[in-house]
Every structure is written in C-alpha cells, then in structure tokens.
C-alpha cells in the first residue's frame, strides 16, 4: 500500500491486487448470480462459469469483483484510522487492461479528508422567540375552514346575478389576434368567483352575469405567465354562463360536531378547545424550526471551515436521487416537476447545491460541537429510538434496523443532541 498526500483536503492510497485475489473475487461474484443463470442445455443454477462468460461476456463479473476489492481496500484504510474521511473515495489510476487480462493490477483510492472546523462562539447565542398565544379569531378561522368543507351547493334562479364566492359553470374560448390558442378553450368549466384561479381581471368581469348570458372578457396575460408565448399578450375570451351555484355553509352546532365524528370532540366547546390546542402545537413546532434556523445560521457565521466541492457534489447527487424517489412515489418525474413549477435545470441544480452546502455545514459543525462537549449516545437511547420508530411506522424493529443501520441512527441522534445543547444554552433576546 502506497500513500500520497495531495494537500490538506486529499489523500491517495494505491494498491496492488494479485491475479489470485482477483480470481477469488471473480469466482465469488459468479457464485452470487449463479442460482439465477439459465442457459439451454443446463439446469438452472448449474451453468458453468466458462459457459456463462462465453455467452454473456465477463464485464459484469469484473465490475462486481472490482467493487468487492474496492470495498475491501476501503475498509482496510478506515481501520488504519490515519485520518477522518468524508463521503465515498474515488477510484483512480485503475489499470483496466491488466484487470481484464486476469493479471496483477493496480488502482488507487482518493479520499477527501474531513475538514477542520474552528468553532468560535457556540454557547450563549442570542435568539428571538414569538409569544405562543392562540387568539379566539384564529380558532374561529380554523373552525370556519372546517365548516367550509361541509358546504353544500344550491343552484341560483335564472334572474340571479353571479356574485363573489358563487360557483360558475361556463364555457369559454380564448383568442389572441382573433385566433384561438392552445389551452384557451373549455366546456362546463367550474370556477369559484374570487378564488383568483384565472388570469387577473377575468373573474371580476364575470361578476353580474346571469345564467344563459354570453359575454366577451378582455384580459392581458401577465409578463410571468407560465405559457411563455402568451406572456404580455392581450386576449378576448367568449364566455357563456350556464349555471350559478351558491355555497351554503352549515351552522355550527353540537349536532353538526357529532356528525363529523371527530376525535375527542363531540360538542362545539370541545371542538374549540381541541382546535386551540392544535393551533398551539403548530405554533410550538414552527417556533422550534425558527429557533433551530437562527442557531444554525449563527453557528455557520461563527465557524471557520472550508468544504471541498467534491463533498458538496456527492451530497447534491444524494439529495437529487432522494427527491426523485419521492416524486416517483407520487407518479411524477423530475422533468414533470420542473415543468409544473416553471423552473429550469440551472435553477433546480442551484437549489440542490445550496441545500447540499447547508447539510454539510450543519453536519461538520454539529460533529465539532459534539466532540468539544464530549457528547455520547448510549446503546439504550439507540434501542429506544428504534422502538419509537417501530411504533410510529407500525413495522417490526428488525425491519427498521435493516433500513436504518445503527451507525447512521447513532450519528443522527448525536447531531440532534448537539443541536439541542446549543439551543438550551441560547439566550432569548428581550
């Protein structure tokens, strides 16, 4: 093993791998896939490796073997504890020809050295807090929102006018320069007047219309309109109003509350009390997030650290993959998401990069706080957290442990305790 220090941020380790070690890993790689291999003339799982290689080639086996070798050498370096690394090392100077010729070959691993963090002030930080008070007005607004969900619609008469909050059922066709445009036509469209769902000015001009009436509505698309070709364009919409419906909000009574079958609330008084407690809990949660943000911003400002771009890039890739997985669960792609929000690749990449930078800063600073304060996480706390997660997600503890390695959970708990310590030592400004 040869070691080369490039600078304070990078260290390279070089290894020589014998053909014997390579062959051992190739055999191991094939044994892993052998049970699934099917070739005519052989029983499934009993295909000789030579036959497999002649039919499908060796690339996959070499790739798997190299991955195992890299992991082995990586662990060897970590066990030496010569330095603290961040992220995954990069494979460098791989002699691929000798590798695929089953000869002794060499390769290197380039590690990013964990940056040094100099903490200045981290205890006694000054923070601000809001008064945690829930007003009767806030409770009333929340309950009104609940009542609106129980709203029924009643049709207005032929002579009634269209008013604010009414639901209009209408056809429309839009024209720019006397020509219809894509997306500018709809039949039996339903719109709550005053909701602001349409282009500014559209809903205002519909006020006062009667059922059966046709009217031209003139608007100008805003400069930031999502359909770029229509931005700043003047348009005329021919609107035919078919039906007007008005919302009927039920009266708040004990009987209504009972009919809603809410948890811990069967009377108006209980509903008000529960609503107040819910709003208070939300405010406490929001305040907690606000305090954490204040503390982290001050810690970053009060710290000296230089983060290698490679680490930020690795975290950026991780964040993007994680986000794409979340979108996939909602049957969305990243491209669809960007199109929906009207953002381009550059803006999306910038957002991921900024978040990655913040994540790494937070991790390094909290690790330094934990080290300076000699914080530790007991096995009891780890097991308790596993149990809490099991109860929350209603899955067995063993399944939680499979998805969340103890090392990762321990690190997360340590970061949380470090942050909690700094917050508890903070001073609230008066």
From Swiss-Prot:
Give GO MF terms, alphabetically.
peptidyl-prolyl cis-trans isomerase activity; protein folding chaperone; ribosome binding
Enumerate the spans annotated as PPIase FKBP-type domain.
Answer: 165-250
Q: Which reaction does it catalyse?
A: [protein]-peptidylproline (omega=180) = [protein]-peptidylproline (omega=0)
> Per the record, what is one GO cellular component?
cytoplasm
Report which superkingdom the organism of origin falls in: Bacteria
Which enzyme class? isomerase
**What EC number(s) does the entry state?**
5.2.1.8
Query: Sorted alphabetically, which Pfam families does this protein's record hold?
Result: FKBP_C, Trigger_C, Trigger_N
Q: Where in the cell is it found?
A: Cytoplasm
Which keywords appear in this protein's UniProt record, sorted alphabetically?
Answer: Cell cycle, Cell division, Chaperone, Cytoplasm, Isomerase, Rotamase
User: Which InterPro entries does the record match to this protein?
Assistant: PPIase_dom_sf, PPIase_FKBP_dom, Trig_fac, Trigger_fac_C, Trigger_fac_C_sf, Trigger_fac_ribosome-bd_bac, Trigger_fac_ribosome-bd_sf, Trigger_fact/SurA_dom_sf
Q: Name one GO biological process term.
A: 'de novo' cotranslational protein folding
Task: State the similarity comment.
Answer: Belongs to the FKBP-type PPIase family. Tig subfamily.
**Function of the protein:** Involved in protein export. Acts as a chaperone by maintaining the newly synthesized protein in an open conformation. Functions as a peptidyl-prolyl cis-trans isomerase.
The record's note on its domains: Consists of 3 domains; the N-terminus binds the ribosome, the middle domain has PPIase activity, while the C-terminus has intrinsic chaperone activity on its own.
- HAMAP family (UniProt xref): Trigger_factor_Tig
Q: What is this protein called?
A: Trigger factor
Organism for this UniProt entry: Onion yellows phytoplasma (strain OY-M)
